Design a protein with these regions (language model features):
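A short helix->loop->beta-strand "cap" motif at the edges of active sites that frequently abuts
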Residues: 91-95
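Short glycine-centered, acidic/aromatic-flanked micro-motifs in structured strand/loop junctions
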Residues: 68-70
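ATP-dependent carboxylate/acyl-activation modules
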Residues: 1-66, 76-80, 84-88, 100-135
Length: 135
């Protein structure tokens, strides 16, 4: 896991450094401020619990934006780890997802059924919702 704490209030969790930076840029573009850079790419993409514990250690975080895009890394595996950790930790933060790529259908179904959250089709829509929720 690669983590850098920042001064904002929108928590960010994405797979891959480029996607994480793009997500941070989008948060800024839509008037928010990122609370962190947290990238779970490479062999860390199954470490959902560790990632959530890191995000939740920052009391400034008011919403969590998850952006998964998988080619080699399977989005269903990433979602499984994150959903399981979410159920164990029972946070009260609002969470917003975009999920695209390998295993997408299963990942979306998992997030819908177990978290009761509807993933966004477009990253911009998820970002706008996360920024609004953090206000």
């Amino acid at each position: 896991l690669k983590y850098i704490e920042l001064s904002g209030n929108v928590g960010i969790l994405a797979n891959g450094a480029g996607l994480t930076m793009t997500t941070m840029d989008a948060v800024c573009y839509f008037g928010g401020t990122p609370a962190n850079f947290l990238e779970i790419g490479g062999d860390a993409y199954t470490k959902g619990r560790d990632a959530l514990e890191i995000v939740f250690s920052n009391p400034a975080v008011k919403s969590l934006l998850v952006n998964f895009c998988g080619a080699f890394a399977r989005t269903d595996v990433m979602a499984q780890g994150l959903v399981q950790a979410w159920e164990e930790l029972k946070p009260t933060l609002p969470i917003f997802f975009t999920i695209h790529g390998t295993g997408e259908e299963e990942a979306v179904k998992l997030v819908r059924e177990r978290l009761g959250v509807e993933p966004f089709d477009l990253m911009d829509d998820a970002v706008i919702a996360a920024v609004e929720a953090a206000k």
